[in-house]
Amino acid sequence: MKYQSPTILATSALLFANSATADWQFRSRPDLAPPRLNITIPASAVEPGYLFLAPFAGLPDTPTAQHGPRQAGPYILRDDGDLVWSGYAIYSIWATNFQAARWRGRDVLFSFEGDHNAGYGHGHGHVTILDQHYETIRELRAGNHKLVDKHEFHVVNEETGLIQIYQPVPRDLTPWGAEPEQQWIVNAIIQELDIATGKVLFEWLSLDHVSPDEAILPINPGQAGSGYNSSDAWDYFHINSVDKDDQGNYLISARDACAVHKINGTDGSILWRLGGTNSSFTLGDGVDFCFQHHARWLSQASDDDDDDDGQEVISLYDNSAHGTEHDSGGEVHTAPTSSGKIIRVDTRTGKAELVQGFYPPDGLRSKSQGSTQILPGGNALVNWGSEGAVTEFAADGTPVFHAYMDSGALGFGVENYRAFRFNWTGLPSEEPAIVSLEDAGGTTLYVSWNGDTETKTWRFHEVSDKHGSREFLGEAKRRSFETSLRVPGRRVNKAVAEAVDERGGVLRGTGIARIEPEILPISAGKGRQVPHPKVSEGEPVEGAPGKVKGLWEWSAIWIAGWRKTGDL
């Protein structure tokens, strides 16, 4: 949770009392209020694909202050912030680590959903997998009477899934400075599961292989848990990511040991450590990292001894910061900013070198969460965790896109665990939504289809009699989540629309929309109506990312300043 001074609290009460900035985005789907990206570096030379995010409020709502996003959950967005799919209420409770993957030859989505304990950085629940129609096809839980944690689910070879578990257990912790009554420690566990059956194929327990001597944060003063009870167990290791190589070995990121470990996939022994108190490698300039997240192999050791040059390349997100979530100790910083990193290790020379670093445009340093995804073309998508921002970099480290995950007043306090870019084809099972709204000058029809990626044109028809006869009204190119067609000078009492793909085929039709009077939003404090943006014509949307006015312009500047400096 972010630090709040009395001045910030007083100001936030003023700024956040009105959460209506999330409203009025879609006439056909007024129930949806997705975050509006605040884009400070518009996309240029980014790689193909959509953005996959699951932002949530890092600050609690109070009677006088409400925080963004108003609808926390998984989202698929375009680079301009336009909504593709809202997973709000489809993934219920609290959802994170939202991604696309392949399972048994099928394109799928998955996300953790369950309980979120922000103070301890843990969560307990299950992994839910959706198909291309956004229907649930699998829920996956941990085996051996354990609970899945929120941090990791990673699909391997389209068949198995890697998960991570926090298991509090009682131990004698006095050798590490504990009082006799401080008896609880977290046993950090990984499992590999058969996704189809849930069968446990491999399990590894940190206390069987890693001594608490490797902990960076001691049990006292309790910054990583005090150990007095199972809910406050000492989290000495804190696994937050797992990967697997072609030889069956595992790569784990242990945040509270500031180290990445390679684990033998047969007996669980540690093959090497990168970083921490007992590194197997001498760290070159810029390699040093701490409190990291999201370690992934980019290239692996060969299983052919003749071809093996001893080199392996990994990516990770270097937080270089740890917060005070347990209300004990102080915030720890090991570098001026967080960063994404590509690191090469050489098991023959015992050296590690920095291949490339990716540093934040706004000097961001996230005390929790974060991810680094190296994209197929060499770009890197770095998510800044508790700072609620995402950046895409060219391979040389030049930022080509940067955005915060909500705008105006609602941008304050937004966080996001991981962010990704994936190609995706969405074919929703639900029918498209349509509304027909009348004003003094005529009728406007609005249509949208949550999750659809294939519609290129919308065709609109008037239903002219009780038998369902249809009269063509016109068509509009689909340029965003919602498309509109203006019918000037007359009422359209009943209307339908058809989604048409790039080959001219009809994908799906809507139900019948009966005409309603158009209600326009009242601008804050002005007592006047403001026009709704003509979404189908691609006109600028008032209050959209980078286009805030008046009070919101001031608040956006204030928030940006706070993000950059930490000072008011």
Show where each model-derived region lies.
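Short intrinsically disordered, low-complexity segments
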Residues: 11-17, 499-503, 548, 560, ...
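Histidine-/acidic-rich catalytic cores in large beta-rich domains
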Residues: 19-538
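Fungal secretory targeting signals
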Residues: 1-22, 568
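C-terminal GPI-anchoring signal of eukaryotic secretory precursors
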Residues: 521-568
